[in-house]
């Protein structure tokens, strides 16, 4: 990667926004794409300048405008974001890199047209975790490179776990991040 490279990020969920913040830290230009205006607003509050809502704008055309016609050198796809991967070939430049980030045990079948990937000679990789990067992660958090504001959906007291977890597990999609207060 080089300073100023464009990184398209499909998904403005927690991992997508953190990835965008890391892009800024490493002097890359993130472009976050999501259909959820609330998530895009959160991304903007985290300092992400370029956001695109596919229901309001043509994603490829907007990427062309932002990048001056180059398209994104890198595209990150977060499967839990509920974004479809069909944008990947149209927004990633020829010879670019696509990374599937995060892990979703519900994801059994990711459909991407291999012909489009081969035609553009895209490099496809996967990043499941940050094993071995714990110290770096703590350092980034301690130095406030990563802003966690708005990520925590609920805080429960340790003594209330027995009562609260069944309620939370009834609708696992209603709660993104839950913190247990042990103090």
Residue ranges and their predicted role:
Residues 1-56:
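Mid-domain Rossmann-like dinucleotide-binding core that forms the NAD(H)/NADP(H) cofactor-binding site
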Residues 36, 104, 130:
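Residues in the short beta-alpha loop(s) of Rossmann-like NAD(P)-binding domains
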Residues 8, 31, 97-99, 125, ...:
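Structural detector of well-ordered beta-strand residues that form the stable sheet scaffold
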Residues 15, 19, 39, 63, ...:
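Aromatic/hydrophobic pocket-lining residues that form π-stacking "cages" and hydrophobic walls in ligand
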Residues 86-90, 131-183:
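C-terminal hydrophobic helical "lid"/dimerization subdomain
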Residues 1-3, 41, 46-121:
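Glycine-rich cofactor phosphate-binding loops and adjacent beta1-alpha1 units
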Residues 121, 127-130:
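E1/E1-like adenylate-forming module used to activate ubiquitin-like modifiers
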